[in-house]
């Protein structure tokens, strides 16, 4: 075999190896893109389900549905009395209608692997609650935490929750957290976070409860990055 024949054979082998590698890279990229697309489609589907379920009640309940999968109740007079954590009768009536429909959506099998956490968030204005702490921020942390916990407690006492299967209850206990954010994320007159907008705080809008769905997007991105580093 001549030297030129040997080189030709090596070039052919190298070409096939290169083509095989390129095809594997393209296949992996297509698989990653499919995972991302499926995830984005699921997030969009959850948002559409929430809009479809509650669009008619938004105005009556003074509720906002965000594309970030947050639901915000912004009428403080309806939700809690000033400085108190007990759920008002008016808000109880809203929760009786809202919570079963909300969790019926999230407990769908197709969303089970897409949800990482369901946050019940309590938010306050900057009014100091010295009965709870000499530090106004901590006093409002405690108040907002109590409020979110009261909402969760109310949900767990509902007949809807009691009638769920044990598997569904375990799933919700894994997902749901009650969080108090004090006045760390107050809102302005446009219901935007005042820290980011640099606008004056609207105390009424800031006193609120939010339900927020945290998806598994961070885990998805981490897995993709790990795959790319292999």
Each language-model region and where it sits:
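Short amphipathic alpha-helical segments
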Residues: 38, 42, 46, 90-94, ...
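Periplasmic peptidoglycan-binding/anchoring modules of Gram-negative envelope and division proteins
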Residues: 84-119, 152-166, 211, 219, ...
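Periplasmic OmpA-like peptidoglycan-binding domain that tethers envelope proteins to the cell wall
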Residues: 89, 123-218
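Short terminal targeting/anchoring segments
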Residues: 1-56, 61
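Short, solvent-exposed beta-strand/turn patches at coil↔beta or beta↔helix junctions
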Residues: 67-98, 127-140
């Amino acid at each position: 075999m001549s030297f030129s024949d040997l080189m030709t054979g090596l070039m052919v082998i190298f070409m096939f190896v290169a083509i095989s590698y390129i095809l594997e890279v393209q296949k992996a990229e297509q698989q990653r893109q499919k995972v991302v697309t499926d995830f984005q489609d699921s997030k969009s589907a959850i948002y559409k389900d929430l809009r479809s379920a509650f669009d008619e009640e938004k105005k009556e309940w003074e509720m906002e549905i965000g594309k970030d999968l947050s639901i915000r109740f912004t009428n403080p007079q309806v939700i809690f009395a000033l400085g108190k954590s007990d759920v008002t009768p008016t808000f109880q009536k809203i929760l009786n209608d809202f919570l079963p429909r909300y969790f019926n959506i999230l407990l769908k099998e197709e969303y089970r692997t897409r949800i990482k956490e369901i946050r019940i968030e309590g938010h306050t204005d900057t009014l100091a609650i010295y009965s709870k702490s000499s530090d106004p921020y901590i006093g409002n942390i405690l108040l907002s935490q109590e409020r979110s916990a009261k909402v969760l407690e109310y949900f767990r006492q509902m007949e809807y929750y009691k009638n769920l299967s044990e598997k569904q209850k375990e799933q919700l206990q894994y997902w749901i957290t009650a969080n108090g954010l004090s006045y760390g994320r107050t809102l302005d007159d446009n219901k935007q976070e005042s820290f980011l907008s640099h606008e004056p705080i609207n105390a009424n809008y800031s006193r609120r409860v939010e339900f927020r769905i945290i998806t598994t997007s961070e885990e998805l991105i981490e897995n993709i990055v790990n795959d790319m580093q292999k």
